[in-house]
Design a protein with these regions (language model features):
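Short, solvent-exposed loop/turn segments at secondary-structure junctions
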Residues: 28-29, 107-110, 143, 157-158, ...
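Double-stranded beta-helix
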Residues: 145-207
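Non-heme Fe(II)-dependent double-stranded beta-helix
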Residues: 1-18, 24-119, 125-128, 165, ...
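Short, conserved beta-strand element in jelly-roll/cupin
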Residues: 127-145, 193, 201, 226-230
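Histidine-centered active-site/metal-ligand motif
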Residues: 70-73, 120, 157, 202-203, ...
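A short beta-loop-beta micro-motif enriched in histidine and acidic residues
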Residues: 121-133, 187-188, 194, 218-219
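Active-site region of the double-stranded beta-helix
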Residues: 98, 123-128, 139-149, 156-157
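Non-heme Fe(II)/2-oxoglutarate
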Residues: 45, 53-57, 206-284
Length: 284
């Protein structure tokens, strides 16, 4: 067994046990720089064309107006290629299975002072038939407690329960609903502080959140991609009628293995859009 295989095996084992794992500095500094440059370009050049987007200006401060851009892989060949980054595929093919597809990407900007997101489970928003949903959260900046890193409750994926959701009025978090009535407390949570270039993998049933970026300057940027087994159907729809309910949404990108439903073809329905602080959301 080579070092690469051994690392990926260990990460996948932790993913199954704890519901998350961290591949520290999986991307090179050059890869991180390229993604940061591309994120800046998307905010400045593409925002005017995004559904619900504003026009970004030329100053760095203008980038801070955006919480996130959804589906950036449809705007950027680099972010499309990153869906199938070898370090991601190495772990997911061990944690999920040999055939893996992606249905969503999100570019989080999270400027200084911007809120976090309350406890939630991603599979509440993107349902699979086999509990295979997983995320690859790529840190484009060092993620710390101060600037709003992820927090997770290790092992909270194991019951396989999707806990109820409710609206909240906690100013620490954005408008997205929060999970509640689960048998864990904040004392069970741990921060996931990682250097730029690290990938945090987490299960779709894992309870996770992030807090406000409490720094006075600077971003906590992250590119977050969602994946699932290619064998599972994707009965997904998005709030507000953006995507109607469907038996199996085929707006996907295969990143590993073979597609057992290739005969259905591929569609292009989801449109990139800017996520504002006061709009409704799909998760991440």
């Amino acid at each position: 067994m080579n070092d690469t295989s051994g690392r990926a095996d260990a990460l996948a084992a932790q993913y199954r046990t704890d519901g998350y794992c961290v591949d520290r500095q999986a991307l090179t500094s050059a890869e991180v720089t390229a993604l940061v440059d591309e994120a800046t370009r998307l905010c400045r050049e593409e925002a005017a064309r995004l559904v619900g987007g504003d026009v970004a200006g030329d100053n760095a401060d203008d980038l801070g107006r955006f919480l996130a851009i959804h589906f950036p892989h449809k705007l950027s060949p680099l972010m499309l290629a990153t869906l199938a980054h070898p370090r991601i595929v190495d772990v997911l093919t061990r944690a999920i299975g040999p055939n893996v597809k992606s249905m969503q990407s999100m570019l989080f900007i999270k400027n200084a002072g911007k809120p976090g997101q309350a406890w939630h489970q991603d599979e509440d928003f993107i349902p699979t038939r086999d509990r295979s949903l997983g995320a690859a959260w790529i840190a484009l900046d060092d993620a710390t407690v101060d600037n709003g890193c992820l927090w997770v409750i290790p092992g909270s994926h194991r019951p396989g329960v999707l806990w109820p959701l409710r609206q909240h009025e906690n100013p620490e978090y954005d408008f997205a609903p929060e999970s509640f009535d689960f048998p864990y407390s904040d004392a069970d949570a741990i921060p996931v502080e990682v250097p730029a270039g690290s990938i945090v993998f987490f299960h779709g049933h894992l309870l996770h959140k992030s807090l406000r970026n409490r720094r006075t300057t600077g971003f906590r940027r992250a590119l977050v991609n969602h994946y699932m087994s290619a064998e599972s159907l994707l009965p997904w729809w998005r709030d507000g009628g953006a995507i109607a309910p469907t038996h199996d949404l085929r707006d996907i990108v295969m990143v590993a293995g073979t597609d057992p439903y290739a005969y259905k073809g591929i569609v292009d329905l989801n449109r990139p859009y800017v996520r504002a602080e006061s709009a409704r959301t799909t998760p991440a």
